[in-house]
Amino acid sequence: MAKTSQKVRNHRPAKFSSREYTRCERCGRPHSVYRKFGLCRICLKELGHKGQIPGLKKASW
């Protein structure tokens, strides 16, 4: 879980555009964040299994 200071800092515009990075909106994780959903892989899987993300379904092939 990200500290509150990191979450607040992430919402401020960066001084340089190359310093901007994605962070999970739910838990604040900086790695493995899907831009389309704004969530990390762990939160995406949890919410997907609960059925809280419309249009998302488990793949089977």
From Swiss-Prot:
Annotated segments matching region Disordered: 1-20
Cofactor(s) it depends on: Zn(2+)
UniProt cross-references to InterPro entries, sorted A to Z: Ribosomal_uS14 (IPR001209), Ribosomal_uS14_bact (IPR023053), Ribosomal_uS14_sf (IPR043140)
GO molecular function: rRNA binding; structural constituent of ribosome; zinc ion binding
Cellular component terms (Gene Ontology): small ribosomal subunit
Co-factor remark: Binds 1 zinc ion per subunit.
Basic residues bias: start-end ranges: 1-14
Keywords: Metal-binding, Ribonucleoprotein, Ribosomal protein, RNA-binding, rRNA-binding, Zinc
Stated role: Binds 16S rRNA, required for the assembly of 30S particles and may also be responsible for determining the conformation of the 16S rRNA at the A site.
Subunit structure: Part of the 30S ribosomal subunit. Contacts proteins S3 and S10.
NCBIfam families in alphabetical order: PRK08061.1
Record-stated family: Belongs to the universal ribosomal protein uS14 family. Zinc-binding uS14 subfamily.
Name of the protein in its database record: Small ribosomal subunit protein uS14
Source organism: Lactobacillus delbrueckii subsp. bulgaricus (strain ATCC 11842 / DSM 20081 / BCRC 10696 / JCM 1002 / NBRC 13953 / NCIMB 11778 / NCTC 12712 / WDCM 00102 / Lb 14)
